[in-house]
Amino acid sequence: MAFSWLSFVLLALPVLALARPSEHEARSLFCSTPSNIPFNDDKLPDPFKFNDGSPVRSFADWDCRRQQLSALIQGYEAGTLPPRPPVVTSTFTKSGTTGNLTVTAGFPGKTITFSSPITFPTGTAPFGGWPLVIAYGGVSIPIPDGIAVLTYDNSAMAEQNDQSSRGVGLFFDVYGANATASSMTAWVWGLSRIIDSLEVTPAAHINTAKIAVTGCSRNGKGALMAGAFEERIALTIPQESGSGGDTCWRLSKFEQDSGDVVQQATEIVQENVWFSTNFDNYVFNISLLPYDHHELAALVAPRPLISYENTDFEWLSPLSGFGCMTAAHTVWEAMGIPDKHGFVQVGNHSHCDFPSSLNPTLFAFFDKFLLGKEANTSIFETNGLFNGTEWVASQWINWTTPRFTLL
């Protein structure tokens, strides 16, 4: 008997009718990710709602919601993060405990080359290679024994001097000065090329499943964005990132309106090029943003994140940092892994100093998530010094945290 595509379709129709996918199954097959949507809310946006208002109930749902948030953050403030380009090659040299990774990336006929020094621990690398910390601009936190450190010259990838830095740097030599990517987005692109190269450089003896990223102040903002956008980062450690980092735009505006001298969106876009020019259109009406930075931080989940803030510096927006990370924490809670998200906020030290009293909190995250040791990482604390401004969670968080199902 002849068998045609038509007869196959006719035979299959009843089966297809019975196997109609559920709403959540359909979303997993097709996830709508616009870069701009209608929105207006003075409260922090609910991370457990899709763009269309339907609920996020499962890990499968979160995969889609994460894609939506990434697209929105790029569309409104970060600019477009390009994918891996067709050309990525590298060379590696090592002498003693000092190595050097040189990466060439771009398109045929238009490539850039940059180098990053790596400091290795003494001794023989463990099975799988050394864990690695990628430090934006240099290390400002203590690193435990047994972890290599790569110093990433992110400012060469995209300058961050002032407004004149727009479109200047190695990234823009590839994608053009008019690329929408902010400097921080360009930094993520460069970091990803480093990881690409390490993945195919066995001589470096780096365990690319155990990579952390860190930075302080402006570089702390960049470290958080790297952890959010680059899923190969195993541990994210922003330090005193302040406005544009682990604080929320809405909460920083509230602090400013309450009389605190903090850096909010209207000022930060005049200082530097950490955000895309499109963000200028929203800084005077933050309520139009369909996200806030609790959701930037939540892009890291389910991977671990611990951030550090300093209440001695009012302009870092201490209430905003605590409130924003309190809101972000609900995503790890929904996943049943709150111990993968930490926050520490104290004072009595200079900006970007790391007091030794904080070492146990930091080393706990290193031990558990990079070194494979047992450690208690249920760490979420503040000294509560918010310059007289009061944090009231119900004023900003109007959602009930779900418990995610698998599907």
Curated annotation (Swiss-Prot):
<feature type="binding site">
    <location>
        <position position="263"/>
    </location>
    <ligand>
        <name>substrate</name>
    </ligand>
</feature>
<dbReference type="Pfam" id="PF22244">
    <property type="entry name" value="GCE_fung"/>
</dbReference>
<feature type="glycosylation site" description="N-linked (GlcNAc...) asparagine">
    <location>
        <position position="285"/>
    </location>
</feature>
<feature type="glycosylation site" description="N-linked (GlcNAc...) asparagine">
    <location>
        <position position="348"/>
    </location>
</feature>
<keyword id="KW-0719">Serine esterase</keyword>
<dbReference type="GO" id="GO:0046274">
    <property type="term" value="P:lignin catabolic process"/>
</dbReference>
<comment type="similarity">
    <text>Belongs to the carbohydrate esterase 15 (CE15) family.</text>
</comment>
<feature type="short sequence motif" description="GXSYXG catalytic site motif">
    <location>
        <begin position="215"/>
        <end position="220"/>
    </location>
</feature>
<feature type="glycosylation site" description="N-linked (GlcNAc...) asparagine">
    <location>
        <position position="178"/>
    </location>
</feature>
<dbReference type="InterPro" id="IPR054579">
    <property type="entry name" value="GCE-like_dom"/>
</dbReference>
<feature type="active site" description="Nucleophile">
    <location>
        <position position="217"/>
    </location>
</feature>
<keyword id="KW-0439">Lignin degradation</keyword>
<dbReference type="GO" id="GO:0005576">
    <property type="term" value="C:extracellular region"/>
</dbReference>
<feature type="disulfide bond">
    <location>
        <begin position="31"/>
        <end position="64"/>
    </location>
</feature>
<feature type="glycosylation site" description="N-linked (GlcNAc...) asparagine">
    <location>
        <position position="387"/>
    </location>
</feature>
<dbReference type="InterPro" id="IPR029058">
    <property type="entry name" value="AB_hydrolase_fold"/>
</dbReference>
<feature type="glycosylation site" description="N-linked (GlcNAc...) asparagine">
    <location>
        <position position="100"/>
    </location>
</feature>
<comment type="function">
    <text>Glucuronoyl esterase which may play a significant role in biomass degradation, as it is considered to disconnect hemicellulose from lignin through the hydrolysis of the ester bond between 4-O-methyl-D-glucuronic acid residues of glucuronoxylans and aromatic alcohols of lignin.</text>
</comment>
<feature type="glycosylation site" description="N-linked (GlcNAc...) asparagine">
    <location>
        <position position="398"/>
    </location>
</feature>
<keyword id="KW-0732">Signal</keyword>
<feature type="disulfide bond">
    <location>
        <begin position="248"/>
        <end position="324"/>
    </location>
</feature>
<keyword id="KW-1015">Disulfide bond</keyword>
<feature type="signal peptide">
    <location>
        <begin position="1"/>
        <end position="19"/>
    </location>
</feature>
<feature type="glycosylation site" description="N-linked (GlcNAc...) asparagine">
    <location>
        <position position="376"/>
    </location>
</feature>
<keyword id="KW-0325">Glycoprotein</keyword>
<feature type="disulfide bond">
    <location>
        <begin position="216"/>
        <end position="352"/>
    </location>
</feature>
<feature type="binding site">
    <location>
        <position position="315"/>
    </location>
    <ligand>
        <name>substrate</name>
    </ligand>
</feature>
<feature type="active site" description="Proton donor/acceptor">
    <location>
        <position position="351"/>
    </location>
</feature>
<dbReference type="GO" id="GO:0052689">
    <property type="term" value="F:carboxylic ester hydrolase activity"/>
</dbReference>
<keyword id="KW-0964">Secreted</keyword>
<feature type="binding site">
    <location>
        <position position="271"/>
    </location>
    <ligand>
        <name>substrate</name>
    </ligand>
</feature>
<feature type="binding site">
    <location>
        <position position="221"/>
    </location>
    <ligand>
        <name>substrate</name>
    </ligand>
</feature>
<protein>
    <recommendedName>
        <fullName>4-O-methyl-glucuronoyl methylesterase 2</fullName>
        <ecNumber>3.1.1.117</ecNumber>
    </recommendedName>
</protein>
<keyword id="KW-0378">Hydrolase</keyword>
